[in-house]
Amino acid sequence: VKCLSELDEQSYLMESLGYLAKGEFGIPGRRYFQKGGVQRTHQVHAFLTGSHEAQRHIAFKEYLIAFPEVADEYGVLKKTGAAICNNDIDVYCRHKDSFIKEHEARALNWKFA
């Protein structure tokens, strides 16, 4: 997005679609929307265009597309995490953390080096 404050002013539009606006939710410069309550079904992340956080997330996504074997491994990791976390997002995130950090670093190097 071009302006976070404009997004904040219009977050009611996302809420009208059933999303809960959660603000930065742990990542400065991000706006996070979640749908489905405890058993989250959808999520939307919005960043300032060109920000480091946006580039980091896009690089990871593009890396997974370029390397389907890594995407498959990530998918298995996510399914395993969902099965063991008992809807505890902190447990789920810790389960994926080392994989994400390793492959995010590779993705940034792959995209920008």
What residues fall within each predicted segment?
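Catalytic core of pol beta-like nucleotidyltransferases
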Residues: 4-11, 15-113
